[in-house]
Each structure stands twice: as structure tokens, then as C-alpha cells.
Amino acid sequence: MKFSVDLTAATRPEWVKTVMADLPAFMQDHADCERKASAMAMSFVAKYPDRVEIIPELIETGVEELEHFQQVYAHMSKRGIHLAKEMKQDPYIQGLMDLCKTDPINRFLDRLLLASIIECRGAERFRLVCNALDKDPELKDFYHGLWTSEAKHGNIFVKMALRYFPEKQVYERLNELNRAEGKLIERLPFRAALH
């Protein structure tokens, strides 16, 4: 059984150029994404307290994402980059959330699967940023570590879904959402942002 997500569309090189042209803005957005990821994991705990089998993993993920926020903030602070005054709307996340079914059971499945896809996209993009950071070895190492961590998170949300839904249903819906994510990523404009 496979828990990882193979993205259907690779990030284009123009995205990396956009990020490298404004690394401070990227890092501000990255910090916001880590805060949101931590909050998302904890929102699963709050919304689904009866799903006791996954609560420990969700708490662990929430804490890890908050540690990532702390780490990116330390790198920002060292470089004189402040946190953004407000968290901007993320058209990528909004586009994905629009794909969620509305009935509570299927929405739960969709949110888990979208979390996997988002984490896998983050891992792919952290790898690209890492590979582009030739002049800052410290930041390069940081993004290398994040790339491996985010890849792991992509797997755990699929595993969580498989605890509550039949394998066929999970993978069919994962493939649908993954294809839709690929189309979304190809049509969004490039920004100095993670998504």
C-alpha cells in the first residue's frame, strides 16, 4: 500500500526565479504557512475529537509545524526580515478548499487528502528552494531539513484517511484531488510564496 502522493504537475522553474528574486517575501509567506499548518492540525483535533486514533499524530504534527514556524522566524530575524503584518489570502489553498465536498463525512476525507497534497507540494517546493540557495549554506540546510519533514507529513494524512475509509475510496478521491491540484498549480500566477 502506498501512502505518498505523486504530484501530477511539477512546479515550473519560473516559480523558483520569482522566489529567489524576493526571498524575504517568500520567508514571510513561509512563516505564515507554518502557523496555518499547525493550526490546521489542531483544528482536526477540535473538529473530530471522536477520531481518537489520529489525535496523537495530529498533535505531534501541530507541534512540529509550530517548531518550523519558530525556526523560519529565527532565520528571518537573523536576516532582518519581519513577520508579515497580516496573513494574506492564499489562492492555492482557497482553490483546494473549494474542491471539498460539503457533507461532513466526505469533507473529513477531503480535508485529510488535501492536507497530504499540500504537504507534498510544500516538500517539492522546499527542495527547489534548497537547490537554488547556493550562496546561503545555512538557509540551504534549513530548507533541506524542511523538505524531508514535509514529505513525511504528506504520508501521514493518507495513512490517517485509510483508518476511516476504504482503500479504494481513499485512492480514487486522492487521484481526483491530485489531478485538480495539478491543474490549479498550472494556472496560478507565480508569487514569492510557498503556494
Enumerate the language-model features and the residues they cover.
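Non-heme di-metal
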Residues: M1-H195
